[in-house]
């Protein structure tokens, strides 16, 4: 919209105009060379100008051809003929992986089905397997086993004695339930150590 200018002997004026709501704007005096805001060209950087000056159609295509749409698309060749050797190889690998994944899933499903079916062992078999384990462990070196057990029991006895000393010295004022249970096992530990030492 062009701004309506009025000129007289006193200078140049922007004429009074009516607003959309019906009120009137005053006429304003304008200096020489003044350009109203609406008429100032919008700044465009060089990239915007470049893209505006660029044709919208690809090179070699006229506007008449584009508007009628008479240009024919070249027929696409088969995907297999355009793929390179490595692309074909990769396609084969992907297909192979898909097949293997499907097979793996089937095997996994079958395995889960087998796990759901509980095959119960008979008590005789359980006893035989546990006896076999115990027999093989004890047949290796019974003296070494007993020595190891004595060592562990002495360690426990030492811990009980240290706990008793802490209680007697007042370091532990109120022993916990577990500590009291540990103290009560002292006699049983001593008896077990004596029995094992006699067997050696």
Swiss-Prot record:
Subcellular localization, as worded in the UniProt entry: Cytoplasm; Nucleus, Nucleolus; Nucleus, Nucleoplasm
Superkingdom of origin: Eukaryota
Keywords linked to the UniProt accession: Coiled coil, Cytoplasm, Nonsense-mediated mRNA decay, Nucleus, Translation regulation
One GO term of the biological process aspect: positive regulation of translation
Compositional bias of kind Polar residues: 64-85, 119-141
SUPFAM superfamilies: Pym (Within the bgcn gene intron protein, WIBG), N-terminal domain
InterPro entries reported in the protein's UniProt record: PYM1, WIBG_mago-bd, WIBG_N_sf
Composition-biased stretches (Basic residues): 86-96
Protein name: Partner of Y14 and mago
């Amino acid at each position: 919209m062009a701004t309506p200018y009025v000129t007289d002997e006193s200078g140049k004026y922007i004429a009074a105009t009516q607003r959309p709501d019906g009120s009137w704007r005053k006429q304003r005096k304008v200096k020489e060379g003044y350009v109203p805001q609406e008429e100032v060209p919008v700044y465009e950087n060089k990239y915007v100008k470049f893209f505006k000056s660029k044709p919208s159609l690809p090179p070699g295509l006229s506007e008449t051809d584009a508007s009628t749409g008479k240009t024919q698309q070249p027929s696409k060749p088969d995907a297999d003929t355009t793929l390179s050797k490595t692309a074909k190889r990769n396609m084969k690998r992907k297909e192979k992986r898909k097949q293997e994944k499907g097979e793996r899933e089937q095997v996994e499903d079958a395995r889960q089905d087998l796990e759901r079916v509980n095959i119960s062992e008979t008590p005789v078999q359980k006893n035989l397997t546990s006896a076999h384990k115990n027999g093989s462990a004890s047949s290796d070196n019974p003296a070494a086993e007993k020595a190891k057990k004595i060592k562990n029991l002495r360690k426990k006895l030492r811990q009980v004695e240290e706990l008793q000393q802490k209680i007697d010295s007042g370091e532990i004022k109120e022993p916990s339930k577990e500590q009291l249970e540990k103290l009560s096992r002292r006699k049983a530990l001593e008896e077990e150590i004596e029995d094992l030492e006699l067997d050696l």
